[in-house]
Amino acid sequence: MITKTSKNAARQKRHARVRAKLSGTAERPRLNVFRSNKHIYAQIIDDVNGVTLASASTLDKDLNVESTGDSAAAAKVGELVAKRASEKGVSDVVFDRGGYLYHGRVKALADAAREAGLKF
């Protein structure tokens, strides 16, 4: 019987392939993106030490958005994570799109983070 593979399982396989080649260091940590149907999350991670340096999501109380699942909310999360990273002294990052296509909410978050001062 032919079964359809889950989109999330395929994304996880793509992410695992990328993560085998991509790692964040203390000098250049990894900007990781996770997208759900309702929310979007971003973390800046130092993989060498296993530490999250900064994070932001649409669940944050200081982020006032009407809708949490659209590109405008993702852009605000990108600005917020870039601001929190600059407070910790992080300016250069490696972008990890998490196996998602670089389009829509993921692209909006990345563009907003770039405009707010992160370099990748």
UniProtKB/Swiss-Prot annotation:
A biological-process GO annotation: translation
Disulfide bond sites: none
Keyword Ribonucleoprotein: yes
Composition skew (Basic residues), residue ranges: 10-20
Annotated region described as Disordered, given as residue ranges: 1-22
Subunit relationships: Part of the 50S ribosomal subunit; part of the 5S rRNA/L5/L18/L25 subcomplex. Contacts the 5S and 23S rRNAs.
Protein name according to UniProt: Large ribosomal subunit protein uL18
Organism: Bacillus velezensis (strain DSM 23117 / BGSC 10A6 / LMG 26770 / FZB42) (Bacillus amyloliquefaciens subsp. plantarum)
The organism's taxonomic lineage, starting at the top: Bacteria, Bacillati, Bacillota, Bacilli, Bacillales
Gene expressing this chain: rplR
